[in-house]
Amino acid sequence: MIKNAFISFQEKKEESKGSVEFQVFSFTNKIRRLTSHLELHRKDYLSQRGLRKILGKRQRLLAYLSKKNRVRYKELIKQLNIRELKTR
């Protein structure tokens, strides 16, 4: 699975599971799982709420990473195949 490949990639860089990149990756996996679940169960409102909460957490982490280190942010966005944050 993708997660195992990413974990080995992270271990090569000797970063902990508490790193921003790993947290964003974990949230992205949860988001993809919940999205596929909600395609089957459209009226599962608790899962919809959980999805919105996880999306918010990931968005805040990405905003933090974007401010702190733009290069790592760009690499992560490209690697996870997600869109960039909207800027105001």
UniProtKB/Swiss-Prot annotation:
InterPro entries: Ribosomal_uS15 (IPR000589), Ribosomal_uS15_bac-type (IPR005290), uS15_NS1_RNA-bd_sf (IPR009068). Keywords: Chloroplast, Plastid, Ribonucleoprotein, Ribosomal protein. Its main location: plastid. GO terms for molecular function: structural constituent of ribosome. Pfam families: Ribosomal_S15 (PF00312). One of its GO terms (biological process) is translation. NCBIfam families: S15_bact. Belongs to the universal ribosomal protein uS15 family. This is Small ribosomal subunit protein uS15c.
